[in-house]
Amino acid sequence: MSDYLKASEEKMQKSLSVLKNELAAIRAGRANPALLDRIMVDYYGTPTPLNRLATITAPEPRVLVVQPWDVSKISDIEKAIQKSDLGINPVSDGKVLRLVFPELTEERRKELVKLVHKKAEEAKVAVRQIRRDANDAVKKMEKNGEISEDERKKREEEIQKLTDKYIKEIDKVVEAKEKEIMEI
């Protein structure tokens, strides 16, 4: 694989990775321990990520259980969760916290699907821009006499195949996320 194609593929792969990360942050019907990754707990005066202070599990699709390693800090963990933007009120039994996430409404699911499609379109635009840049570079090489017209056409076809591959990948990722969101 030539340098221009390798560079284009790396950029397209990066666009796909960004999309996957953005979609992972969108909550589908299931409670995911990663939802608590951003929560910081005051641990002896030091803000500490919750996942470094407790075991977080998802025993049921809409329930997370937070089991602190230091049970004396359960009230601090509870306060940190209440202050977060999750809008969830933890239930404590003194040893563990249970977080019950409400069922997503049909309307909210549709909003999330729209958001997924918007993010996908942004990724596709980025991939197409990479294709445009690569094609411009190839045309410039032809203009400077570095490659022939036939070579330019061949390279443009390779770039187009690569673009098509990544657009299909984006569509697959979006389809899977949409299915996950609409699943009840």
From Swiss-Prot:
Belongs to the RRF family. It is found in: Cytoplasm. Keywords: Cytoplasm, Protein biosynthesis. Signal peptide: none annotated. The keyword Transmembrane does not apply. One of its GO terms (biological process) is translational termination. It comes from the Bacteria. The gene is frr. Transmembrane segments: none annotated. GO terms for cellular component: cytoplasm. This is Ribosome-recycling factor. One of its GO terms (molecular function) is ribosomal large subunit binding. It holds the Pfam family RRF. Its main location: cytoplasm. Responsible for the release of ribosomes from messenger RNA at the termination of protein biosynthesis. May increase the efficiency of translation by recycling ribosomes from one round of translation to another.
